[in-house]
Amino acid sequence: LRAGDRGLGDVAGLLAAGGGGAELGDGAVVLKIGLLGVLRISGATQILIMFFCYCAIEQTAMLWASSYMVGMDGMAEDVAATFTSIFLIGITVGRFANGFLTMRFSDPAMIRIGTMTIGLGALLLLVPVHNPALSAVAFILVGLGCAPVYPCIIHSTPTYFGADKSQAIVGVQMAFAYVGTMLMPPLFGVIAQATTIAVLPWCLLVFVAFMAAMHE
């Protein structure tokens, strides 16, 4: 909830911001752009939707992985909770590796690699073999795929939109991230309760598809 308050505060601050600009120490000017101004920037809406989808994937997978393994693989609850840490290990290892990979690959390339890896992990969950080891590998892949997306989106924002607009755009990106983080895990819970936990990989694939489409 505190994270959500910060996200709403970002949006409120952007809505209140007027025109003009502030000069940085190196002489560069940072434009003060309101929320509507950010949304009018070409490509900004797509990158915001992409950020929302990424955070929806990360948080939904992290919070529902154990329930999925209990419901689909028959895993004991305490073991499933332990296995959920594998997803976070995937993100951690991926972020460490990204520090080296970004020296060779561009931000767009890293985002594409991450998106494809998430998709591969979600597809593995659809294999009609209820095997805890297979699910563990699938969630590791989802975690590895998540690793480069968030930092590479942030890092590429000045390149895509210019340093003068990047501060405002990153603020709105954070707000969309908080909304995706808060909204989608409980919403998936409602969906799973009305249907079955087996829809988790399908939900992940839908968000991956949106994320890929918005990036391209």
Segments from the language model and where they lie:
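A late C-terminal transmembrane helix in Major Facilitator Superfamily
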Residues: 160-197
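Helix-to-loop junctions at the C-terminal end of transmembrane segments
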Residues: 94-107, 192
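Juxtamembrane intracellular "pre-TM" segments in multi-pass secondary transporters
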Residues: 15-47
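Structural signature of the two symmetry-related core transmembrane helices
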Residues: 109-124
